[in-house]
Amino acid sequence: MDSLIQARYVIVSMNGKYGIYDREKNDSVTAVDMDYIEYSHYFQPEESMCFCYFYYEKGLQCGKIGINMNDNTKMEAFADNPRLVGKVEEFPTIDSLILARSYDVLSECMAAIDGIQGQVAVIDASTSDVLAWGALENVEGATVAAPLLKRLCSLETYMPFVAADCLAQSKTSLEDSVDTGQGVLVLNDSVRIRDHNWRRGGYGMLTYRQALLNKSRIGMYHAMKTLPDGMDYWKYATGQTKNTNAMELATVFNYIFHLDSVNVSADRRSNIRAIAIEMFKEGGIQHKRAPKNVELAGVYNVADDGTEQTFTFVGCFPADKPKYAVSMVVQRKHKLPASPAMMSDKVNELIEWLNKK
């Protein structure tokens, strides 16, 4: 920062927020309510007029603040922060009919489960073109269009596929046995892994295939630990700080599932495909969620942090030669019950409609 500016304007912080303070005039130039501020540049259009510019980020927006150094009046220019918010205009392949139908289904799903915000995305599985990406939120009881948040949900949805990939890399068969015990695994004094049925005594001894198809967290943990760096995989798969969105979920799932576009070994592809397809067949925990008249590969997930619940679906179809990849994410305030069944009917409406298109 220029010495003159540095002597006069300082960036102050309070409770994790930032603002600009004028030491010369003992004046708070801005409120201390921004997420990030940094000095940008100094501009002197004429001898008697000087401006100091700062870059800032606040919520979903970013911009520049220009301060008139004579009287501290401000000029601001702001826009959606491209790191946090996507734009439909960036995707010339958007299909207006698919987008409209996707919005309808997302709106109905949010109404059915009291969603506060949600996203839906449809990808062309053969070209990876984005055909639809939309977002809605509930504002005072009305469902309205919302910004396309790039950080909406956890990567935890992918856990069964990460586990299947780890088994292939470690040359461990899906038919090998894994002991999930009584549904609770104590790693240390502060970390416990619980299966969803731990109150009923857990799954006990399973094959890895059964463990992954039943989404046993203990089984998936042991699958990842078959690799020397398995704990890193576990932290990545369960890390709440590594967030994604409906468009990325659909795109990445299509990438790892589509044989022609993945530069990994046949064993790794085979494991991922097997788990993704068998999730919706007899023996898979989601077999009752399968759509009619189309073979689906994918997964549902419900994440609950005690405050909010995130319902997520990602998948592609038809499984033998995918035409579309779809993802839907809906968030709501924590309450019980919470099950994938609460969104699967609406997801299947979209899948079955697309399959006939």
Language model region names:
Residues 90-158, 165, 169-171, 188-191:
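Short pre-catalytic segments that frame enzyme active sites
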Residues 210, 232-356:
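A penicillin-recognizing enzyme superfamily signal
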Residues 66, 70-119, 310-313, 319-320, ...:
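Extracytoplasmic/periplasmic proteins that interact with beta-lactams or build/remodel peptidoglycan
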Residues 1-89:
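Residue-level detector of conserved, function-critical positions
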Residues 147, 172-229:
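Conserved catalytic neighborhood of penicillin-recognizing serine enzymes
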Residues 107-108, 164-171, 222-225, 251-258, ...:
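Short glycine/serine- and small hydrophobic-enriched flexible loop segments
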Residues 102, 109, 120, 128, ...:
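Residue-level preference for non-acidic, small/hydrophobic
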